[in-house]
Amino acid sequence: MSSRELIILGCSSQQPTRTRNQGAYLFRWNGEGLLFDPGEGTQRQFIFANIAPTTVNRIFVSHFHGDHCLGLGSMLMRLNLDKVSHPIHCYYPASGKKYFDRLRYGTIYHETIQVVEHPISEEGIVEDFGSFRIEAQRLQHQVDTLGWRITEPDTIKFLPKELESRGIRGLIIQDLIRDQEISIGGSTVYLSDVSYVRKGDSIAIIADTLPCQAAIDLAKNSCMMLCESTYLEQHRHLAESHFHMTAKQAATLAKRAATQKLILTHFSARYLNLDDFYKEASAVFPNVSVAQEYRSYPFPKNPLLNK
């Protein structure tokens, strides 16, 4: 199993269908379990996906329309029931604090887990852990809505043959990293001569929105982009009036953002068959998948290497 993968727990929008639950998305990032927009029934979806809810340690709510948050309370209660020892970090728009509290304390139960709230009022870097950072930007929806980007830093990868040919080893390598150049054997060796930069992996989560610059910025050069595509082009008027996107619009955003992989989700219940979503989007952006519940999407290999 990939250490970095996106698992679809639900892909419907406001109304579930017989085959699609309200949206919920689990992103596994090495040892982290990041749960995005847990809609109604998310706890049960974990069972069908054969995934332990205890793997979750961060929960993100883009906005407080029901299909993006009604599963929050039950997930917190389940984690409480399972007596998880790790803290549960919750990220959400600060303007929705009262709704977060209602979901968290909507029933009688004795909370013993540590829930750490991160109400977000400012756009930009929310947290930077060194190994990865969380970024939030406001999208263009009917209510205060956040899109997310998870990014790891770029890393220096050395070329062993180049190091060996120049006699560079041991502590000298640390000097080279620090100073970007060293003098050895009567010549100057630059860091770029013996290494390349591997671009850090990244994923963008684009929830309910009209096409907007913030969505493009979040997905810019990302490895993967999970994006709402509630409607097909034939119902574009509905997308515009409800502040959503069509599959074609989502694909156009992906193309402009130069993401590697687009995954469409958040489908209106009016569509029983989703084949046309793929046809519409792939005509604009070839590397596209239509979200399927319980399916895992491993991260594509990052080809962005500066040698």
Swiss-Prot record:
Catalysed reactions listed for this entry: Endonucleolytic cleavage of RNA, removing extra 3' nucleotides from tRNA precursor, generating 3' termini of tRNAs. A 3'-hydroxy group is left at the tRNA terminus and a 5'-phosphoryl group is left at the trailer molecule
Keywords linked to the UniProt accession: Endonuclease, Hydrolase, Metal-binding, Nuclease, tRNA processing, Zinc
Active site, per annotation: 67 (proton acceptor)
Cofactor binding, per record: Binds 2 Zn(2+) ions.
Binding-site list for Zn(2+) 2: 67-68, 208, 266
Cofactor(s) for this UniProt protein: Zn(2+)
Residues engaged in binding Zn(2+) 1: 63, 65, 141, 208
Listed InterPro entries: Metallo-B-lactamas (IPR001279), RibonucZ/Hydroxyglut_hydro (IPR036866), RNase_Z/BN (IPR013471)
GO MF term list: 3'-tRNA processing endoribonuclease activity; zinc ion binding
Enzyme Commission number, as recorded: 3.1.26.11
Pfam family, one: Lactamase_B
Function field: Zinc phosphodiesterase, which displays some tRNA 3'-processing endonuclease activity. Probably involved in tRNA maturation, by removing a 3'-trailer from precursor tRNA.
Assembly with partners or alone: Homodimer.
Family: Belongs to the RNase Z family.
Protein name per UniProt: Ribonuclease Z
Organism listed in the record: Chlamydia pneumoniae
Gene giving rise to this polypeptide: rnz
